A protein has these predicted regions:
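Acidic, gly/ser/pro-rich intrinsically disordered tails
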Residues: 1-2, 6, 10-16, 37-40, ...
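Ordered, amphipathic secondary-structure segments that act as subunit-interaction surfaces
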Residues: 18-26, 33-50
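Flexible glycine-rich surface loops and low-complexity tracts that mediate binding to linear polymers
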Residues: 20-34, 126-139
Length: 183
């Protein structure tokens, strides 16, 4: 996957950023709204907080888990369950993740298989924690001229999910406990 990142110059001053060098990025997956033409576009970027150059021993371990993300947030839009043309069950979700200074990031997520069937039943306001990877995928969008344009979507592909039923923003508080699901 190719992912857009935002890095401060002060972070990369003493780091060899040559093509082919391995680095470890620690940061936050953030969203930004950009007004384009007549609509808002959600931009997603990895905001880099630290970069580490791993030694050879660390590198082998890190290669086993090259892209990991953890989100702790609230479902802010109704889920959309569907089956792909290849028969895969998926659920699309939008998660609001709060951060400092009363800001929130809105992160699109996709759950597969058993997780998708479980997520289909989640409600707006539900508190969830999820683990997965940030993925990029190409898709075709028809424009006003009836031509197709290739675009890139960024989303979190969910591998594990925890539904925190005792801490949610729903209007009714009738459930307790938590559920844990892993693909």
């Amino acid at each position: 996957d190719l992912l857009p990142v935002i890095i401060s110059e002060r972070i990369i001053n003493d780091i060899d950023m040559s093509i082919g060098n391995y680095i470890v990025i620690d940061g936050q997956f953030r969203s930004y709204n950009r007004y384009e033409d007549t609509s808002n576009k959600l931009l997603l970027r990895v905001f880099v907080r630290d970069i580490i150059v791993p030694d050879d021993n660390e590198l082998e371990e890190l290669k086993r888990h090259p892209n990991e993300v953890f989100l702790n947030g609230y479902l802010c839009k109704e889920t959309k369950f569907r089956t792909t043309p290849f028969g895969r069950e998926i659920t699309d979700m939008l998660i609001a993740v709060n951060r400092s200074y009363n800001k929130s990031d809105y992160i699109p997520c996709i759950a597969w298989g058993r997780n998708a069937r479980y997520c289909e039943k989640l409600e707006v306001g539900d508190h969830i924690k999820l683990w997965g990877r940030i993925q990029s995928r190409k898709y075709q969008k028809k424009n006003d001229n009836e031509d197709y344009e290739t675009k890139t979507a960024y989303e979190v592909s969910v591998t594990k999910l925890e539904h925190i039923k005792t801490e949610n923003n729903r209007k009714k508080e009738d459930e307790e406990g938590e559920d844990d699901f892993e693909e």
